[in-house]
Amino acid sequence: MKIVHYSDVEDVVIDKFPYKGKTNEVKGTSIRWLSKQGDDGHGYPEYGLRYFTIQPGGYIPIHNHFYHQTMYILEGRFECWCFDAASDEIKEKSIATPGHAVYIPSMEPHGMKNIGESPGAFLCCICNVYEQES
């Protein structure tokens, strides 16, 4: 067993996210890896729990990934976006506030912005998926 307090974990600023061969700017966002286990062979852990902080007006742009993720909003007000995979146009916008859980399936293009007036925070649990062998 390992017990950590989130404030004892390094807070790493994120300034870029890759998507479809391009690098997109991330604004006002930092991450703390509370736990991570395994290696999926693509540079990601098989399981992880992360603590994100996004400053007012900060955002995470369109991106996708192999792993499933569920975000649990702790503080703040977020506009969450789901994009059409072919056109990269926003196909759905939703507001998430404390107590909301946001599930993102594997490879779904998505992003979010802190639309509140104070820093927002959420837990993000990731779990990789694997292709079934035939």
Give residue ranges: language-model regions.
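A short, N-terminal "cap"/entry segment at the start of jelly-roll beta-barrel domains
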Residues: 1-46, 94
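Short, conserved beta-strand element in jelly-roll/cupin
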Residues: 51-55, 65-80, 84, 125-127
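Double-stranded beta-helix
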Residues: 2-9, 16, 85-88, 109-134
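Short beta-strand His + acidic residue motifs that chelate non-heme Fe in jelly-roll/DSBH
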Residues: 60-62, 80-82, 104, 110-117
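Conserved hydrophobic/aromatic beta-strand scaffold that supports enzyme active sites
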Residues: 31-33, 49-53, 70, 93, ...
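Short regulatory "switch" loops immediately downstream of catalytic or recognition motifs
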Residues: 33-37, 76-86, 92
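Short acidic-glycine-tyrosine-enriched beta hairpin
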Residues: 85-106
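Conserved short histidine dyad/triad with adjacent acidic residue
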Residues: 35-37, 48-65, 106
